[in-house]
């Protein structure tokens, strides 16, 4: 018996064939099983003959139209099989040739017979089967599931024999059913460029996707909408400003023009809109400022100056026009000289003094604002002697001081100074370093006019200033309320920072948009030391000003770094504070003295990291403070004791600070409910608040401090029972509810530096709840209600925002994963009060922790304080990465350089000297002076030609231009402490 049935004997094979053929005949009688939607042809039943050959193990079924199969194919298969067996047995080449010819002939006949077979014809039903593939899908070209042998592979190439032409011959165009490059094929098609508008009915509820909208048509519709609204309500200033900003959006669609032309056309459009708006709103100051800014961007300096002069002649009392006229001359490299600018200030003062008789309060404020700007200009040009004489005479005239007041003699011995200069000149330093060191030494020591007898020893005629030289800048202030403002301006000119620096204070003093007046690093210290009751984040804030102190970004005499005149200048500032404060009423006097005590605290904070510790400075300060507090007028002033306690804390005496605060609380009545005087009650609540904040401070915090807070707060109620804490909570809650029920009073800010009673009550209540329950959500809800309630009183709302940020920063420093509320509160506050220094310090720290790719500096509008905070954040990030040796440090450095380039193109802040000085400091720190030093010098001088410190810093960045720098200083008549004769000697010597 064979293993396979195919190789069994013939009888079995024949019987099996008969059975199969009989079965197939019976099955083919019905053709229902062949019914199919794609094959509807009638199929006749046919007789199938299946030949199972013994030569193969496979069953071959072949069909035909008339005769299904014949024995020919099986016969041929038999012959090919036997022939292949015989071929293996033959050894001679002749026999193999004969057999191969015979097999080839058989194969050829078999191919021709298979081609002659008829094919079935049927109707094709291909509806909804085929479609035109118009969208390329690259996934169809990948055959990842097949092995490499199953994938089709084509070699297409052209080969040449002999010479190959240098010019590439174009390949023949293959007529294929697909295109090689669909994009190229679409581009070569002739397109219909005529835009045909189709009228379609769109359902109102149907939302059109963003990629379907026609942006240009949308902008046209929006322009039409603005025009219609402005026609209906031309007095809407906010709508006019939005329409002006909208022109920047339209400029993005003008791609057919150059960038410079687009910018100019946009400014022209804005100018025409502003002029139309001023026709309807002639009294709007904001629109007038925009008009002057746009005029300055499209006109040369000389033409712009003439245009403004024409406007000033029409409206001589308009301070905005006077400021623009002065700035047009001051900011022009060609026109700026010190005498020209001072002549314009003189004319302005004369007109404002004449008009002050009609409305004293208004014109006194304008006169003081212009006086402050004039003093800042004198400081920038280096004319400290002239500046101080102007301040002194104005204070004597308006504060009723003695004629000999504020007169300081022999600040420093001139002979010692000459000896120091000789040591510098004898050193073999480069010429630029010799000049810089001599200039800075004299600049630090000279700020007061010398007498006529000392002039012969000094030899510098510009150091001798008499009252007649500044008589044009000395004017009486008619309204008595303006004396406090004059005192603040006088101290700001001496480089005393505002402590704290709030948005409302800057706005009230007119310093929000005064970008060209910022030239020295002292204004940056409130970023590191805000003085708003902060309890956390001290090291993070101090890291923001890293390198600023070492960079010597100061001007004139300074109180930060050690030099021969540091202590004399500090004594000079203290004496000025005391003289001004003692000549003011009680409330304003307290403001000035609190400001001075905070300034002393700031100096202690900054001196902690000095490499050389001077115990004499601390001892001298303590003796000065004790002498101040021993006076009868100051002995019972709780504000002064609070500030003295905080100075003790900064000196490292924490226990002494707590004892002073507790003693001050217990010195008088400890129950606020029993005090009727508003100021005394405010001072007591502020003591409680300061004590709580000091105990919760993260630098000195202990777990026992919470228990101490709960013990101290019991003093607020007179009853001493077991339920004392509940009574305190009820009392504070009632105070907060009364605040929410009554409308807060919107009054002028006369207390810039004194605490606010409502704010301190809310802070004490929230700190008590936080210590007792540790529930931050409850605290946030209270602040939200209070902030919403006092939205009509901006200075109080800003204080409450600060207090909320303080407690949130404390909480999220302990729980860093949950800072969502902090971020939300921060951005809400910056939207309303963008120039609050405490909020900006938190914002700068968060920016410094971001990677470079996450920082977006494409915003077109910056305030000068926001720009400075971004600079500090970038410096902190770059320094930190450089210390780690991280590759991202260079990306951060490039990002910071790019940020400075953006500032140089922003009209509102590009004239800020301090931004340019920080830019030059960055070049010095990272050895980029050779690449960018000369370029930055030319750009900075073109935008700030009056700022003497720009030239001083440029001598370090671009020392090869020293001679040119010195010549420009003399041409502009800026202050140069090295006389021309000494300068010639230095030039000839080296």
Regions found by a protein language model. Name each.
Residues 1-990:
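Polyampholytic low-complexity alpha-helical segments
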């Amino acid at each position: 018996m064979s293993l396979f049935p195919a190789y069994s004997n013939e009888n079995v094979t024949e019987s099996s064939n008969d059975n199969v053929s009989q079965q197939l005949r019976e099955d083919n009688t019905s053709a229902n099983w062949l019914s199919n939607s794609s094959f509807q042809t009638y199929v006749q039943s046919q007789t199938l003959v299946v030949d199972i050959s013994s030569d193969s193990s496979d069953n071959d079924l072949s069909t035909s139209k008339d005769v299904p199969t014949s024995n020919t194919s099986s016969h041929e298969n038999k012959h090919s099989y036997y022939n292949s067996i015989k071929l293996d047995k033959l050894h001679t080449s002749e026999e193999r040739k004969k057999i191969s010819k015979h097999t080839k002939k058989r194969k050829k006949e078999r191919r021709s017979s298979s081609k002659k077979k008829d094919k079935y014809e049927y109707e094709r039903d291909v509806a909804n089967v085929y479609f035109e593939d118009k969208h390329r899908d690259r996934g169809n070209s990948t055959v990842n599931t097949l092995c490499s042998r199953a994938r089709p592979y084509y070699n297409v190439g052209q080969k040449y024999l002999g010479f190959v032409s240098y010019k590439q011959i174009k390949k023949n165009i293959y007529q294929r059913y697909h295109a090689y490059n669909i994009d190229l094929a679409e581009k070569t098609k002739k397109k219909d460029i005529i835009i045909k508008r189709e009228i379609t009915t769109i359902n109102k509820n149907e939302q059109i996707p963003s990629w379907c909208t026609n942006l240009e048509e949308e902008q046209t519709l929006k322009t039409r909408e603005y025009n219609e609204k402005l026609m209906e309500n031309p007095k809407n200033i906010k709508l006019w400003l939005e329409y002006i900003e909208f022109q920047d959006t339209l400029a993005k669609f003008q791609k057919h023009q150059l960038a410079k032309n687009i910018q100019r056309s946009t400014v022209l459009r804005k100018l025409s809109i502003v002029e139309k708006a001023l026709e309807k709103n002639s009294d709007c100051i904001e629109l007038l400022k925009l008009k002057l800014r746009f005029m300055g961007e499209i006109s040369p300096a000389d033409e712009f100056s003439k245009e403004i002069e024409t406007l000033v002649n029409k409206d001589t009392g308009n301070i905005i026009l006077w400021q623009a006229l002065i700035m047009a001359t001051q900011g022009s490299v060609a026109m700026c000289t010190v005498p020209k600018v001072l002549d314009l200030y003189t004319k302005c003062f004369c007109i404002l003094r004449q008009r002050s008789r009609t409305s004293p309060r208004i014109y006194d404020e304008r006169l003081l604002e212009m006086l402050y700007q004039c003093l800042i200009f004198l400081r920038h040009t280096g004319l400290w002697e002239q500046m101080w004489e102007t301040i002194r005479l104005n204070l004597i005239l308006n504060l009723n001081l003695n004629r000999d007041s504020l007169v300081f003699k022999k600040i420093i011995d001139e002979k010692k100074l000459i000896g120091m200069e000789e040591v510098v000149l004898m050193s073999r330093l480069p010429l630029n370093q010799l000049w810089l060191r001599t200039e800075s030494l004299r600049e630090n020591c000279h700020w007061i006019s010398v007498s006529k007898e000392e002039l012969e020893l000094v030899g510098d005629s510009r150091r001798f200033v008499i009252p007649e030289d500044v008589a044009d800048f000395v004017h009486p202030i008619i309204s008595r309320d303006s004396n406090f403002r004059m005192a603040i301006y006088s101290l700001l000119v001496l480089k005393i920072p505002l402590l704290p620096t709030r948005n409302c204070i800057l706005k009230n003093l007119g310093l929000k948009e005064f970008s060209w007046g910022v030239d020295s690093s002292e204004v940056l210290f409130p970023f590191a030391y805000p003085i708003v009751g902060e309890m956390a984040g001290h090291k993070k804030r101090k890291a923001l000003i890293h390198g600023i102190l070492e960079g010597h970004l100061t001007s004139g005499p300074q109180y930060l770094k050690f030099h021969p005149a540091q202590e004399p200048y500090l004594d000079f500032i203290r004496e000025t504070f005391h003289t001004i404060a003692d000549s003011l009423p009680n409330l304003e006097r307290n403001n000035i003295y609190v400001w001075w005590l905070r300034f002393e605290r700031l100096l202690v904070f900054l001196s902690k990291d000095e490499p050389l510790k001077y115990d004499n400075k601390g001892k001298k300060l303590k003796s000065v403070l004790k002498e101040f507090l021993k006076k009868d007028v100051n002995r019972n002033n709780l504000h002064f004791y609070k500030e003295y306690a905080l100075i003790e804390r900064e000196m490292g005496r924490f226990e002494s600070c707590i004892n002073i605060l507790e003693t001050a609380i217990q010195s008088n009545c400890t129950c606020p409910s029993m005090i009727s005087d508003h100021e005394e009650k405010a001072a007591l609540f502020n003591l409680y608040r300061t004590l709580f904040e000091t105990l919760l401070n993260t630098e000195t915090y202990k777990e026992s401090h919470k228990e101490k807070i709960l013990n101290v707060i019991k003093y607020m109620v007179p009853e001493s029972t077991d339920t004392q804490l509940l009574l305190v909570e009820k009392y504070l809650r009632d105070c907060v509810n009364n605040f929410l029920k009554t409308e807060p009073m919107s009054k002028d800010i006369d207390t810039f530096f004194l605490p606010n009673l409502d704010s301190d009550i809310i802070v004490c209540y929230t700190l008590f709840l936080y210590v007792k329950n540790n529930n931050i959500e409850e605290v946030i809800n209270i602040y939200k209600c209070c902030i919403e309630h006092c939205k009509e009183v901006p200075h109080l709302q800003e204080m409450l925002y600060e207090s909320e940020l303080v407690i949130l920063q404390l909480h999220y420093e302990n729980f860093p994963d949950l800072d969502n509320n902090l971020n939300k509160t921060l951005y809400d506050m910056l939207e309303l009060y963008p120039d609050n220094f405490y909020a900006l310090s938190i914002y700068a720290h968060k920016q410094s922790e971001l990677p470079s790719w996450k920082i977006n500096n494409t915003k077109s509008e910056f305030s000068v304080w926001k720009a400075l905070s971004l600079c500090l954040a970038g410096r902190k990030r770059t320094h930190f990465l450089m210390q780690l040796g991280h590759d991202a440090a260079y990306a951060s450095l490039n990002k910071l350089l790019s940020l400075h380039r953006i500032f140089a193109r922003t009209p509102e802040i590009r004239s800020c000297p301090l931004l340019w000085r920080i830019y030059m400091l960055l070049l010095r720190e990272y050895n980029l002076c050779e690449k960018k030093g000369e370029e930055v010098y030319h750009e900075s001088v073109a935008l700030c030609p009056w700022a003497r410190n720009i030239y001083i810093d440029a001598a370090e960045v671009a020392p090869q231009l020293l001679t040119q720098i010195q010549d420009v200083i003399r041409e502009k008549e800026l202050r140069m402490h090295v006389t021309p004769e000494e300068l010639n000697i230095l030039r000839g010597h080296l």
